[in-house]
Amino acid sequence: MRIGVLGYQGGVYEHVYMLRRTFDRLGVHGEAVVVKKPEDLKGLDGVIIPGGESTTIGILAKRLGVLEPLREQVLNGLPAMGTCAGAIILAGKVRDKVVGEKSQPLLGVMRVEVVRNFFGRQRESFEADLEIEGLDGRFRGVFIRSPAITAAESPARIISWLDYNGQRVGVAAVQGPLLATSFHPELTGDTRLHELWLRLVKR
């Protein structure tokens, strides 16, 4: 199994480390590689889009010729996991909490609506215990300038919710082999969400 991590920004090497731990836990012979160029997409069984700044990631991926071939591969069935900014990149519709509709380079492959900066800026970062469909027990979510998943249309569905300032919003969603999270599972040391996604990859 060969999993790529989009390598422009954010928790790239944290995801590589978590993948290696997850391969060991699942007893899978796997390789985690960093993706920066179109040729790095060859032979992948799945791809992770990490956190960071979604506009910057999208612009770099487009400028370096990765965005369009990656979109084509995902539409043809390549499993993908997006965390925080990565969830924005996967989303079909994106708004900003302050300025409204956003025009930015996206994959746009999941039928979800995401609101950028929903939980505030860096200084409003927080952690919360989450219930996630498919996981036993709670999962500690790390939210850093995180988006919220405010809507999902079939075949996408929200698998984790959070009550925030009196509003119930989605913080994780799946659509076939695609997984989007508002939070940063790579910062927790808990491999269960990576395990959940790799099981989708193996199907």
Curated annotation (Swiss-Prot):
SUPFAM superfamilies in alphabetical order: Class I glutamine amidotransferase-like
Positions contributing to L-glutamine binding: G52, E53, S54, R116, I144, R145
Quaternary assembly: In the presence of PdxS, forms a dodecamer of heterodimers. Only shows activity in the heterodimer.
The protein's role, per its UniProt record: Catalyzes the hydrolysis of glutamine to glutamate and ammonia as part of the biosynthesis of pyridoxal 5'-phosphate. The resulting ammonia molecule is channeled to the active site of PdxS.
Protein name from the UniProt record: Pyridoxal 5'-phosphate synthase subunit PdxT
Active site: C84, H184, E186
One GO BP: pyridoxal phosphate biosynthetic process
A Pfam family recorded for this sequence: SNO
Enzyme Commission (EC) number: 4.3.3.6, 3.5.1.2
Catalytic activity: aldehydo-D-ribose 5-phosphate + D-glyceraldehyde 3-phosphate + L-glutamine = pyridoxal 5'-phosphate + L-glutamate + phosphate + 3 H2O + H(+); L-glutamine + H2O = L-glutamate + NH4(+)
The organism of origin for this protein: Aeropyrum pernix (strain ATCC 700893 / DSM 11879 / JCM 9820 / NBRC 100138 / K1)
